[in-house]
């Protein structure tokens, strides 16, 4: 009797251990499918990709991740925080993928795996409307300019002004909205950001802002970064497949036209970024 009881207890314990091990053996995609939720981290000061419209999170990223969610059979849970905390938040496991998006660079590719690109990310300058002192990018020499902290756009702006004969003073802002506010107030003469972003801002406020042509930055693309490890491989594979389907059936172009007024020709993947 005691022997049979001991044997049953041993089998039960083994079952519990096996079940627990099985739960831990699930990779990121399996856990997300089991929970039914994909957690996506982003900021809300990067229009038209992410911004707050009448108290609601809106933008290209919201629309595109809605389509990704349909393909994966899950719902999206947005985790909103300042941009400088987004990539550290990904690595800390606060969410499953960044819905920023971020400029694809060689340095970032060493650390993260990027999805197919969603738009061009070449950097240009935004100035005050009617400011004739800045008619080309080189005109910011010796002046005060600004950009968003911890961004690839800010890095390109700093590199560009270093090439000018009269070095510009580059101010770093917590977000692009703060930089745009200082530009409108005349505290700086230009803001460096990706062309899609500043074109959207200038379109929304044509009496206040104007894009300086041509862009000064290196040709680059925006994509969503995720973790580059075995646990997240199947998740990133699934998101990549979903995004390529969304691109090929025309949904991406429709979303781009909604937010940019035009569609971008982008490669399926950026394997060798210029930056």
Residues covered by each model-derived region:
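Ligand-binding clefts/hinges and TM-proximal coupling segments of bilobed small-molecule sensing domains
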Residues: 27, 152-170, 210-211, 243-275
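Acidic, polar ligand-binding/catalytic clefts
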Residues: 70, 75-139, 215-216
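Extended ligand-binding regions for polar small-molecule ligands
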Residues: 62-71, 131, 143-144, 150-151, ...
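Extracytoplasmic small-molecule ligand-binding "clamshell" domains
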Residues: 27-101
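Short helix-initiation/N-cap motifs at beta->coil->alpha
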Residues: 77-88, 132-133, 170-185, 220
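Periplasmic-binding protein-like
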Residues: 44, 120-127, 203-240, 262-275
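A ligand-binding cleft/hinge motif common to bilobed small-molecule-binding domains
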Residues: 85, 102-110, 156-161, 184, ...
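Ligand-binding cleft/hinge of the Venus flytrap
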Residues: 52, 65-74, 153-172, 202-206
């Amino acid at each position: 009797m005691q022997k049979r009881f001991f044997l049953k207890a041993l089998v039960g314990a083994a079952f519990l251990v096996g079940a627990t091990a099985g739960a831990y053996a699930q990779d990121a995609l399996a856990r997300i499918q089991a929970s039914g939720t994909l957690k996506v981290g982003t900021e809300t000061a990067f229009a038209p990709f992410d911004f707050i419209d009448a108290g609601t999170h809106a933008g290209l990223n919201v629309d595109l991740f809605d389509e990704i969610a349909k393909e994966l059979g899950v719902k999206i849970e947005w985790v909103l925080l300042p941009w400088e905390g987004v990539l550290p938040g990904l690595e800390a496991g606060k969410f499953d993928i960044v819905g920023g998006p971020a400029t694809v660079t060689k340095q970032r590719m060493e650390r993260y795996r990027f999805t197919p690109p969603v738009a061009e990310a070449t950097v240009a300058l935004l100035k005050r409307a009617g400011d004739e002192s800045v008619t080309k990018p080189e005109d910011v020499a010796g002046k005060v300019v600004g950009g968003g902290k911890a961004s690839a756009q800010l890095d390109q702006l700093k590199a560009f002004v270093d090439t000018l004969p009269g070095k510009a003073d580059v101010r770093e802002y917590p977000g692009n909205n703060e930089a745009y506010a200082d530009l409108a107030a005349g505290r700086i003469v230009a803001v460096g950001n990706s062309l899609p972003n500043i074109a959207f801002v200038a379109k929304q406020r044509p009496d206040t802002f104007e894009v300086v042509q041509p862009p000064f930055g290196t040709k680059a693309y925006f994509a969503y970064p995720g973790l580059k490890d075995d646990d997240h491989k199947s998740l990133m594979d699934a998101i990549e497949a979903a995004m390529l389907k969304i691109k090929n059936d025309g949904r991406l172009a429709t979303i781009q036209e909604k937010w940019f007024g035009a569609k971008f020709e982008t490669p399926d993947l950026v394997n060798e970024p210029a930056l």
